[in-house]
């Protein structure tokens, strides 16, 4: 599998990342290298290997479950393609 320049632009658009035309070939090469590595990993036989989340056993750090006022709608909605008042506006998908 490989990524073309149009796919790089589409990924950038979906991620809301501004990518210049001169950066597209470099990102294309990097994404293709990542995909090649993933294909190598997919070829590894892991039959009988127990699944794990970390090489070293580490307890998960938990944060306090505290209700806050938030009061940062502009920060939260900064990357929203469309918004209305203090809400994300999404296209209608169900008739």
From Swiss-Prot:
Belongs to the GatC family. The keyword Ligase applies. Allows the formation of correctly charged Asn-tRNA(Asn) or Gln-tRNA(Gln) through the transamidation of misacylated Asp-tRNA(Asn) or Glu-tRNA(Gln) in organisms which lack either or both of asparaginyl-tRNA or glutaminyl-tRNA synthetases. The reaction takes place in the presence of glutamine and ATP through an activated phospho-Asp-tRNA(Asn) or phospho-Glu-tRNA(Gln). Its EC number is 6.3.5.-. The lineage of its organism: Bacteria, Pseudomonadati, Pseudomonadota, Alphaproteobacteria, Hyphomicrobiales. It comes from the Bacteria. It comes from Methylocella silvestris (strain DSM 15510 / CIP 108128 / LMG 27833 / NCIMB 13906 / BL2). This is Aspartyl/glutamyl-tRNA(Asn/Gln) amidotransferase subunit C. Keywords: ATP-binding, Ligase, Nucleotide-binding, Protein biosynthesis. GO terms for biological process: glutaminyl-tRNAGln biosynthesis via transamidation; regulation of translational fidelity; translation. Heterotrimer of A, B and C subunits.
């Amino acid at each position: 599998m490989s990524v073309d320049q149009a796919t790089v632009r589409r990924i950038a658009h979906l991620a809301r990342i501004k990518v210049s035309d001169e950066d597209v070939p470099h990102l294309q090469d990097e994404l293709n290298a990542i995909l090649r590595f993933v294909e190598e990993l997919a070829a590894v036989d892991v039959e009988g290997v127990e699944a794990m989340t970390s090489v070293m056993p580490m307890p998960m750090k938990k944060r306090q479950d505290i209700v806050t006022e938030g009061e940062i709608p502009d920060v939260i909605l900064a990357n929203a393609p469309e918004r209305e008042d203090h809400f994300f506006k999404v296209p209608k998908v169900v008739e």
